[in-house]
Amino acid sequence: MAEAYGSFSEVYDTFMDNVPYREWAGYIEEKLRQQGIEEGLVLDLGCGTGSMTEELADAGYDMIGVDSSPEMLEQAFEKKETSGHDILYLLQDMREFELYGTVRAVVSCCDSLNYILEPEELLRVFRLVNNYLDPGGMFLFDFSTEEKYRQIGEDTIADSREEGSFIWDNFYDPEEKINQYDLTFFLREDSGLYRKYEETHMQRAYSAEEIKTLLQEAGMEFLQAFDSYSEEPPGTESQRIVILAREQGKSKKME
């Protein structure tokens, strides 16, 4: 699995302020309600700084958040203190996460599952999800497609805000289907000086068919795929796909 966010977590929300969390949360809520899930426990897998977790808590769900980055969870805890939501955050690797019981739904947003670099490990994640879902529970998640990584290619992205600046150097290997991005960022300190940090992250491109096969192998029922957070089916130009799957038994062995 790729490296978890470290120092960049301090400004993650600042530089990712273009992500429409509220809109996506409304979409997720509607899909869950269509399946009869209007309340109860919901797991946000790869919750990051807790932005989506907070939105779903606002919608009335009892939220659990799992993430492998202590720095990202620190930001999530700060949001929790502000909102007053009773959210349980767990510092765990999604490949080995453990819960105290089952949940009505699991969600995973913002490419979190693309950080799983091997299909065998993604299968293990799916089996864990299936294991911790209530009977008939729902799994809704998104992932970035190979088309997205091809479009980004070897681009360099730069941005600057009051809190700091960052440079994002991207490299995509179409043979290995691995996308690597090197983050160089400068965070402003209390003294007014800037400190330099560097992080490297990797994600894997999966096709919708690969995802469907792994879900079924994990024991889940594949229901639908959507072009991003819309009602349209995915196509060859889709850069983000949303998947809806359902628990249908615990017959598959955990490995």
Task: Kindly give the residue locations of the regions a language model identified.
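C-terminal lobe and adjacent flexible extensions of AdoMet/dcAdoMet transferase-like proteins
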Residues: 204-255
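Residues lining the SAM
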Residues: 109-111
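A short acidic, Gly/Pro-enriched loop at the edge of an enzyme's catalytic core
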Residues: 98-105
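Conserved class I S-adenosyl-L-methionine
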Residues: 1-38
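A short glycine-rich, Lys/Arg-flanked "PGG" loop and its adjoining helix->strand segment in the class I
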Residues: 123-135
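Class I SAM-dependent methyltransferase SAM/SAH-binding core
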Residues: 43, 50-96
